[in-house]
Amino acid sequence: MSLANFPTIELDYDSLKSKISNFNSIFDRFLQEERKKLLNNKNEYLRQLSEINEAQKKAEKSLEQTEARKQNFTELLEKEHEEQAITEQEIFSFQEKLDAMLKRKQKLSEELDHYRAIISSKRELRAQEMEAKRKQDSYNNPELKFWEDYLGLKMEGVHDEVIRFIFTNIDEKDWNKQFSFQINLAERDYKVVHCHPPLPHVDDLVNKVNRTRDFYQFLKDMRKGFRELHRKDLSQLI
């Protein structure tokens, strides 16, 4: 395709130049107005920013004063809470002591009633035992005298409710050699608290007397046990 085939365009350069000049003038005015607006906006922004900063300073100062008053109030409130806590603790401690004293009083009262009942029961039991002993002694006095005179039985009070029974006339080489045991009579059931020399089956004998309540038979069994132990010791020496 050749240039001859394109249409011919006639340009009015003077008119185009005038239009471009007008456009440039309009655009320059637009730029100046926009610069002026930007400058005004900037100045307004700086003014508002200054006002905001001033207001912020005033607000911060007011906040500091408020915080100071709040701190003073908080310290005062904490002090009151501490004093209240101390008072409540003192009241609680006093109440605990009072409750403990009341419980202790109740416990002591219950223990007192319990021991009164035990003492009353023991007195009644002791009276029954003394009556039974009195009746038994009326039958056994001759036998007891025989035990004391011929079998070498002696009785000694060790301390309250504990009696020592001493046997002699067991060792043929030394008739004065003592074989003894101590028995506690405080409770209804007897209890051997010391035995010399020790008998291996003493617990069985104690259980027997507690079951039968035959104390004289118990003395016979204990003396028999000492004799058997002595004979066993002699046989081991031979």
Curated annotation (Swiss-Prot):
One Pfam family per UniProt: Spindle_Spc25
Q: Report which residue ranges the record marks as coiled coil.
A: 28-141
GO BP: any one term: cell division
The text of the family note is: Belongs to the SPC25 family.
Function summary: Acts as a component of the NMS (Ndc80-MIND-Spc7) super complex which has a role in kinetochore function during late meiotic prophase and throughout the mitotic cell cycle. Acts as a component of the essential kinetochore-associated NDC80 complex, which is required for chromosome segregation and spindle checkpoint activity.
Q: How does it assemble?
A: Component of the NDC80 complex, which consists of ndc80, nuf2, spc24 and spc25. Can self-associate. Component of the NMS super complex which consists of mis12, mis13, mis14, ndc80, nnf1, nuf2, sos7, spc7, spc24 and spc25.
Q: What is this protein called?
A: Kinetochore protein spc25
- In its UniProt entry, the species of origin is given as Schizosaccharomyces pombe (strain 972 / ATCC 24843)
Lineage per the UniProt record: Eukaryota, Fungi, Dikarya, Ascomycota, Taphrinomycotina
